[in-house]
């Protein structure tokens, strides 16, 4: 038994799927990368996210980008992808331009 499976068993987590199914709502060309609006299912809940994929040949490293938690609950994934808010929070698009695949989900009760 792997360490991850054993830890999941100890703390009562559901088994981790090898692949996560998702739907793609839209794709936008952002010069050095594409930004896809996606939704995926986790524990019965749809999670909206942006998926930023660099152009060119991979493989590419990947990173999960979480947004800040503040009074602007209508901002979430869009702020870290440079669409709204504080330009200093726009690190998702900078990472995509640097060659990283970025997934930027909304936290519960933010944006969508």
Segments the model singles out, each with a brief description of its role:
Residues 49, 59-70:
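Short beta-strand element of the alpha/beta-hydrolase
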């Amino acid at each position: 038994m792997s360490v991850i499976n054993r830890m999941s068993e100890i703390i009562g987590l559901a088994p981790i799927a090898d692949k996560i199914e998702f739907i793609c709502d839209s794709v936008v060309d952002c010069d050095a990368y594409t930004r896809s609006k996606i939704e995926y299912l986790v524990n019965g809940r749809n999670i909206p996210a942006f998926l930023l994929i660099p152009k060119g040949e991979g493989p590419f490293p990947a990173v999960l980008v979480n947004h800040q938690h503040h009074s602007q609950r209508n901002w979430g994934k869009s702020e870290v992808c440079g669409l709204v808010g504080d330009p200093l929070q726009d690190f998702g698009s900078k990472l995509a331009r640097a060659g990283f695949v970025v997934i930027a989900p909304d936290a519960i009760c933010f944006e969508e």
